[in-house]
C-alpha cells in the first residue's frame, strides 16, 4: 500500500499543500514522504508519494521516481508481480540503473505507450508525468483494486489515493445530494466514476486519464468482456489445464516478497483450493495462517480449516471477533470512511485486520484477494 497525491496548476505554496495531502493519507505509507515539483505548460506539476514496501524491499528506489533516459516521472501504488519478466523483455532496448518496479514502468511506457499496462500482471494505480511532452497520465488496474480519485478546482487538477487527501489539498467537501438520495432509496453506489461528493470523481477500473494542461481525456485500456471472450476460442479439453495454470500463477504471486505474511482462511472451497495449490508450489518460510470467526467456534469453518492445514507445517491461529470489537470498529469506520461501507463483512474484516496490525503483519493473503494493512 502506498499513497499517491498530485496537483497540476497554479497553486500557492504547492509543496506545502502536497505535504497536507500526504499527511491526510500517511497511514498508507509510514516512510518519510517524497515530493517532486516542476514546471508544467504555464503552471506547475507537483507529485507526492507515501511508501509502504511489500515486495522489492531492498531494491525499491524512492518515489516519485525520475528516469532521465525516458524523461518520465512515475509513482506506483500496488504491485506488478511479473515486473522481472517485463524487464527481461526490455533489456535488449534499454539499460537499467535500478532493480525496482518503477524503472520497469518508465521503460515499458516509453516502449509500448498505453499498451504497456496490458502486459502488467498485478493490482496498481500508476501516475506518469512526461517531462518532455508535459503530459500527465493516471492509470487504474483492471478491477479497481487500488483507489485513485481526482477533482478540478479553479482550473487546477488534484488527484490522490483517498478522498480525504483531496480535501486536505483544498478541494471543497460538499456532499452529493443526488448520490446520497439514490443510495438511501435504492442502495446504489452510482456509476463507476462517481463518488458521494460533488466534483470528486474516481478513475474507473481499467481506465486511463490523460491530461495535457488543457483537457482531461478518459480512455478504457482493459475490457473484461473482451478478455473473457478470448477463452471461448480455447478447446474444451484445454480449458481445465489453462485454468490450473492461471491459478498456480495467481497463488504464486500472492506469496511473493520478502516480508512476513499472514494467510487468512475462511473454511471455504476457495481456501481448500488455495492450500492445495500452495502445497504444490512450496510454502514460504515467513508465512503464518489465521482465521477469524464470529459466534461459536464449532459453527464456523475454523475446524475444517485446521483439518485442511494438518498436512502442512503451517500453524493456524484463531481470531474471535466479538460484539464489542465490531461496535468499536463501526465507530472507527464511521469517522474514517468518506463513503458508505458495504455491510457487516467490512466491519468484521476491519476488526480482523486491526488484530493483524497489532501482530505487526501488514501483508495478508487470502484465497480470493490480498490486503495491505496500515
Regions found by a protein language model. Give the residues of each.
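Short acidic/polar active-site loop segments enriched in Thr and Asp
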Residues: 31, 361-362
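Single conserved hydrophobic/aromatic residue that forms the stacking wall/gate
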Residues: 362-366, 370-374
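Cysteine-centered catalytic environments shared across enzyme families
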Residues: 1-338, 349
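Active-site rim elements
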Residues: 341
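Aromatic/hydrophobic pocket-lining residues that form π-stacking "cages" and hydrophobic walls in ligand
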Residues: 305, 352, 363-364
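Glycine-rich phosphate-binding loop signature in dinucleotide/nucleotide-binding domains
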Residues: 257-258, 356-361
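A conserved donor-nucleotide-binding helix/loop in the catalytic core
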Residues: 344-357
Amino acid at each position: 500500500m502506498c499513497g499517491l497525491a498530485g496537483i497540476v496548476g497554479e497553486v500557492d505554496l504547492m509543496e506545502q499543500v502536497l505535504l497536507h495531502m500526504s499527511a491526510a493519507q500517511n497511514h498508507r505509507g509510514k516512510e518519510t514522504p517524497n515530493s517532486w515539483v516542476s514546471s508544467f505548460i504555464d503552471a506547475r506539476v507537483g507529485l507526492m508519494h507515501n511508501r509502504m514496501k511489500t515486495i522489492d524491499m531492498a531494491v525499491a528506489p524512492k518515489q516519485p521516481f525520475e528516469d532521465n533516459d525516458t524523461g518520465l516521472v512515475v509513482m506506483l501504488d500496488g504491485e506488478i508481480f511479473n515486473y522481472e519478466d517485463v524487464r527481461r523483455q526490455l533489456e535488449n532496448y534499454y539499460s537499467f540503473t535500478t532493480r525496482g518496479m518503477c524503472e520497469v514502468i518508465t521503460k515499458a511506457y516509453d516502449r509500448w505507450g498505453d499498451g504497456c499496462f496490458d502486459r502488467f500482471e498485478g493490482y496498481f494505480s500508476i501516475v506518469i508525468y512526461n517531462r518532455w511532452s508535459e503530459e500527465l497520465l493516471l492509470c487504474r488496474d483492471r478491477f479497481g483494486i487500488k483507489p485513485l480519485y481526482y477533482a478540478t478546482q479553479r482550473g487546477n487538477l488534484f488527484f490522490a489515493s483517498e478522498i480525504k487527501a483531496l480535501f486536505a489539498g483544498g478541494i471543497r467537501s460538499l456532499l452529493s445530494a443526488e448520490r446520497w438520495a439514490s443510495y438511501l432509496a435504492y442502495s446504489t453506489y452510482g456509476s463507476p466514476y462517481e463518488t458521494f461528493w460533488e466534483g470528486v470523481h474516481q478513475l474507473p477500473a481499467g481506465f486511463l486519464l490523460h491530461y495535457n494542461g488543457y483537457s482531461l481525456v478518459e480512455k478504457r485500456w482493459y475490457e473484461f468482456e473482451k478478455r473473457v471472450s478470448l477463452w471461448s476460442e480455447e478447446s474444451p479439453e484445454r480449458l481445465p489445464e489453462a485454468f490450473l495454470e492461471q491459478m498456480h500463477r495467481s497463488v504464486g504471486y500472492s506469496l511473493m516478497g520478502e516480508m512476513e505474511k499472514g494467510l487468512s482462511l475462511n473454511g471455504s472451497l476457495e481456501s481448500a483450493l488455495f492450500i492445495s495449490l500452495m502445497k504444490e508450489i512450496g510454502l514460504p518460510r515467513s508465512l503464518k495462517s489465521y482465521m477469524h470467526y464470529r459466534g461459536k467456534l464449532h459453527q464456523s469453518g475454523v475446524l475444517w480449516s485446521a483439518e485442511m492445514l494438518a498436512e502442512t507445517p503451517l500453524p493456524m491461529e484463531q481470531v474471535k471477533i466479538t460484539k464489542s470489537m465490531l461496535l468499536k470498529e463501526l465507530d472507527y469506520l464511521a469517522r474514517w470512511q468518506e463513503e458508505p461501507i458495504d455491510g457487516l463483512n467490512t466491519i468484521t474484516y476491519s476488526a480482523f485486520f486491526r488484530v493483524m496490525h497489532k501482530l505487526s503483519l501488514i501483508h495478508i493473503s487470502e484465497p480470493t484477494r490480498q490486503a495491505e494493512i496500515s
